[in-house]
Regions:
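Small-residue-rich segments of transmembrane alpha-helices in multi-pass membrane proteins
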Residues: 28-32, 94-104, 140-156
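Alpha-helical transmembrane segments and their membrane-interface exit regions
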Residues: 116-128
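Membrane-interface helix termini and inter-helical loops of multi-pass transporters
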Residues: 41-56
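Helix-adjacent hinge/juxtasegments
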Residues: 76-105
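Transmembrane helix interruption/hinge and helix-loop junction motifs
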Residues: 106-113, 158
Length: 158
């Protein structure tokens, strides 16, 4: 109830996320969760070797997979930007490519990824407020961003 009240006070009504995007988003976060667990001492799961690059290297998995996801999020934002018309169109297209450019020029550490995922959530808010993202979008992105950022914060290699 407190989270719902807090969200309403911010003007955000968290709606039910459709099951397919929810399932895929959770599945998409699992490599970062696994990487964080490796970085805090979980022994590698040998059965993952045939399917998961960096299956035994938490730092490599975290950095490389995190880069991929940030670039993927730029693509999602680009898709939202295609819905824009009028004065905001140039701005939202420009904002949509910012995560990909950030990855290309600046992401070298898990800390860089942490900043990137935080910034993408701010962009999620912008696109949602402009009604370019679906009504349920923040209900998906907020908990997912918290999980991903927690993995990057607590599970980053030292």
């Amino acid at each position: 109830a407190n989270a719902r009240t807090l969200c309403r006070s911010c003007g955000i009504l968290l709606m039910n996320t459709p099951r397919i995007p929810l399932f895929l988003a959770i599945a998409g976060a699992l490599p970062l969760v696994y990487a964080a667990l490796l970085n805090v001492g979980l022994p590698p799961v040998a059965e993952l070797q045939p399917w998961l690059p960096y299956w035994d290297d938490g730092a490599g998995l975290m950095l490389n997979y995190g880069r991929i996801i940030l670039v993927f999020m730029a693509g999602v934002l680009w898709g939202f930007a295609t819905l824009s018309t009028g004065k905001m169109t140039l701005l939202v297209y420009g904002l949509s490519i910012a995560p990909a450019l950030y990855v290309f020029f600046y992401v070298h550490t898990p800390q860089d990824l942490l900043y990137g995922f935080g910034a993408v959530f701010v962009l999620d808010l912008v696109f949602w407020r402009l009604r370019l993202a679906p009504p349920w979008w923040l209900g998906l992105r907020l908990p997912l961003t918290i999980i991903v950022c927690a993995c990057l914060w607590f599970g980053a290699p030292v």
